[in-house]
């Protein structure tokens, strides 16, 4: 019996070493470990038959069994190290950057000049404590005109100046309508800035477009004066254009009283850049505010005009042409 069991152990060693050497994955190697050296493995099954042997035979077979176990374990360790090294090398080869290969061109994104002006302006006003407000581009006559103290016979209501829709609505001609809707929902104090796209029935040329962008600001509180308005505009224009001379000229807007145009001295000449004024009491009443308690100011400007001045653009149509040769300059 001893010689038979000894032969089985030696055959198991030879078979196991060959199988381990042929294992090509760590998963397969683990299967072989369990098969040969696990609790229910082949080596354990052979050793359980030692109970039938005499006391003199057991030490010899036990020594052979330990030798077989150590040999198989050594083969497992060696093959595991080899497979792990190969796995790491394969991963390194896959992730290695070949600096001799040509690069892949990735076009660099640019900020459109209109978006750049809007972002800069909003940053200034948000820094002053204003909240950004958005509104509808398709409006009713009430919010676009009537609530803003624009009477039915005002030239702005003319079919030649406004895009009227078949259902009686219109495309907003300014972002002032955002202010009315906001005031209807909120109580003073209010400090908002409203950017957005607006529409006018203008003939498209180098300085006019039927679609353009405005940014308007509104402040409502107790005790606000024209001095507060002037100070706010000066801070804003200095942030956008630098410390340049500005002036206020008397003007007229139906929704502000008094009203003014703001000029900026740019390259030796005065440029009209903004309109502004104190909110008309009739506008206050239309949203349920008491003009005896609250005062307010409003101002607005065209984003395209700012972009054309700051970037020295001679034709507003360039801003909408999607010409990459032009846009890559910004």
Curated annotation (Swiss-Prot):
Subcellular locations according to the entry: Cytoplasm
Positions annotated to bind Mg(2+): 257
Major site of localization recorded for this protein: cytoplasm
EC number: 6.1.1.20
InterPro entries per UniProt: aa-tRNA-synth_II, aa-tRNA-synth_II/BPL/LPL, Phe-tRNA-synth_IIc_asu, Phe-tRNA_ligase_II_N, Phe_tRNA_ligase_alpha1_bac, Phenylalanyl-tRNA_Synthase, tRNA-bd_arm
Keywords, sorted A to Z: Aminoacyl-tRNA synthetase, ATP-binding, Cytoplasm, Ligase, Magnesium, Metal-binding, Nucleotide-binding, Protein biosynthesis
Reaction(s) the record says it catalyses: tRNA(Phe) + L-phenylalanine + ATP = L-phenylalanyl-tRNA(Phe) + AMP + diphosphate + H(+)
Entries under NCBIfam families matching the protein: pheS
Protein name, UniProt field: Phenylalanine--tRNA ligase alpha subunit
Species in which this protein is naturally found: Trichormus variabilis (strain ATCC 29413 / PCC 7937)
Phylogenetic placement of the source organism: Bacteria, Bacillati, Cyanobacteriota, Cyanophyceae, Nostocales
Gene: pheS
